């Protein structure tokens, strides 16, 4: 059986990667989207932009409720926050978007490949080889073009280590209890 050669392989399924994959699929290119995590969407969808905006909306709504009496709305003085419900809502929003990305990949005939992708070297005979490691097993795929859309990760300041008081975006967005106070360094 002849080896499959993709027109384009994209490493990383965050906003840059999935947008490139969708467009390539729409143009009729044989496309592979390689993602190291078990779900598509990258940092933005799972531990960045989307969950942050979901929590921000909750905070804005809470803030608006304090002025409810001015608008003739009564009975909100005894409002309570159910942090578990807030986190559940955030999780549902993220899951809905992740499912939507899977649908868009299928709709646009983009093949998703699970695993950690890396280029093995320069182009050979007009194709690149991408090594994909999943569950400690390596496979290889070939592509005429490769887009590196590997995204970002949290970086701690020198001398700081993540612990129960120093948190990255990943830990902060999955807190089981709402903190009484919080300082954010960086953006």
Locations of the language-model features?
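N-terminal Rossmann-fold NAD(P) dinucleotide-binding loop
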Residues: 17
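Beta1/beta-strand and adjacent pyrophosphate-binding region of the FAD-binding site
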Residues: 2-14, 180-185
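The conserved SAM/SAH-binding core of class I Rossmann-like methyltransferase domains
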Residues: 11, 34-35
């Amino acid at each position: 059986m002849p080896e499959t050669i993709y027109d384009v392989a994209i490493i990383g399924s965050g906003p840059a990667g999935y947008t490139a994959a969708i467009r390539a699929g729409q143009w009729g290119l044989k496309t592979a989207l390689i993602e190291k995590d078990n779900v598509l969407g990258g940092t933005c969808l799972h531990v960045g932009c989307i969950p942050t905006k979901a929590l921000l909306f909750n905070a804005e709504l809470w803030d608006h409720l304090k002025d409810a009496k001015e608008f003739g709305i009564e009975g909100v003085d005894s409002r309570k926050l159910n942090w578990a419900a807030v986190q559940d809502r955030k999780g549902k929003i993220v899951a809905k978007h992740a499912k939507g990305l899977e649908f868009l990949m299928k709709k646009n005939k983009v093949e998703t490949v699970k695993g950690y992708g890396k280029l093995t070297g320069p182009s050979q005979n007009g194709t690149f080889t991408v090594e994909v490691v999943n569950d400690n097993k390596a496979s290889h795929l070939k592509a005429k073009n490769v887009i590196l859309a590997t995204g970002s990760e949290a970086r701690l300041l020198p001398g700081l280590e993540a612990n129960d008081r120093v948190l990255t975006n990943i830990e902060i967005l999955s807190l089981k209890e709402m903190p009484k106070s919080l300082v954010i360094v960086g953006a």
